[in-house]
Regions:
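P-loop NTPase motor domains
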Residues: 6-9, 16-332
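N-terminal pre-Walker A segment at the start of P-loop NTPase domains
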Residues: 1-2
Length: 332
């Protein structure tokens, strides 16, 4: 028998080995013991190994903890829990960082990555200010066409802070707009949107979120498409088919939603299968954003605790197979 003192597992444990030498089987042994010990157990498996999933379920059942088990699997979306990887954050800038970190940053790509970060951050700030939770689908929609979000936010802001006659003034300006009297970059925009922009500009109305939307709105559409071209394909992959329903949860779906704070408070068990063999890009993006989310939650717990009145922090055991495929800068 080979024994390992639990005190030796405080911090990180790294297990190295090539294929078929038993690294996953050893992980199963450690996972089984953590489940039976009553820990919060999180298993992240890039390939989505069916045997590992079966072992997690079997051990949870044997420990009387099946009700605590939540399964998120990109390979079986119809049976999977849902998860919004950019919906929870300590700072709003984390939303843009989790998306932009999936983009290449070598050479000339670095500039496009910074542009993508800025525009995603503008969209995320506007959504939160409107009382909406950011998700991949909303980000994809508005990074393709910022105009609807600009109009919504501008109207929301003016309703709260504008003059009593702002609507009439905007309508008057909009009625006089044509392609002959607007800048080339704004040709093709709706007259109502251009009227709002001109009203805000002429009245020197400044608010940080609104200013960001205005600066984006005034770009020529073809130029804007070029500078955010790097993030578009990634978001399309994350928002296509049945995977979109998992990664951008909506209220009408009755499948459970994975929330790390909830998992930790109820001392749950989570199995995550990323199905990397089917789509490496999506698996890497979701896995990296998931780790960034966990790091953010860890920071919240460190500063504020569980927030449920309990002074006792549960033991959290995180098992990540093929960790090198998942790790991002946020975790280091």
């Amino acid at each position: 028998d080979v024994w390992m003192n639990l005190d030796e597992r405080v911090g990180h444990t790294l297990l190295l080995g090539t294929s078929s030498v038993g690294t996953t089987r050893l992980a199963e042994l450690l996972i089984a013991q953590d489940i039976r010990r009553g820990d919060v157990v999180i298993v992240i498996d890039p390939k989505g190994d069916a045997e590992l999933l079966q072992r997690v379920y079997t051990d949870a059942s044997a420990a009387g903890r099946v009700a605590d088990l939540l399964i998120f699997h990109l390979g079986f979306p119809e049976r999977s829990a849902r998860y919004n990887a950019i919906g929870r954050f300590s700072r709003i800038t984390e939303v843009a960082t989790r998306i932009a970190n999936q983009l290449p940053s070598a050479g000339n790509s670095a500039a496009f990555k910074e542009f993508a970060w800025r525009f995603v951050n503008i969209i995320a700030r506007a959504l939160v200010s409107l009382g909406e939770q950011p998700d991949f689908e909303r980000i994809r929609r508005y990074i393709s066409d910022i105009e609807p979000l600009f109009v919504r936010y501008a109207r929301h802001y003016l309703n709260e802070n504008g003059d009593d006659d702002w609507q009439e003034a905007v309508e008057t300006r909009a009625s006089k707009i044509s392609n002959r009297n607007v800048p080339h970059a704004m040709r093709g925009r709706h007259a109502d949107a251009v009227g709002l922009y001109q009203y805000l500009q002429l009245n020197s109305i400044y608010e940080p979120v609104l200013d960001g939307l205005m600066s984006t709105f005034k770009y020529d559409g073809s130029y804007f498409d070029k500078i955010v071209s790097s993030v578009g394909p990634l978001l399309e992959k994350l928002c296509s088919g049945t995977v979109a329903e998992l990664l951008s949860p909506r209220g009408e779906d009755d499948r459970p939603v994975l929330d790390w704070m909830d998992v930790i408070r109820r001392r749950g068990i989570v199995y995550v299968g990323l199905d990397a063999l089917s789509d490496t890009t999506v698996a890497s993006a979701v896995g990296n954003a998931m780790f960034a989310d966990l790091v953010s939650v860890a920071g919240h717990l460190y500063k504020h605790g569980l927030g449920d009145g309990s002074d006792i922090m549960p033991t959290i055991s995180l098992h990540a197979d093929e960790f090198n495929e998942l790790i991002g800068d946020e975790f280091v």
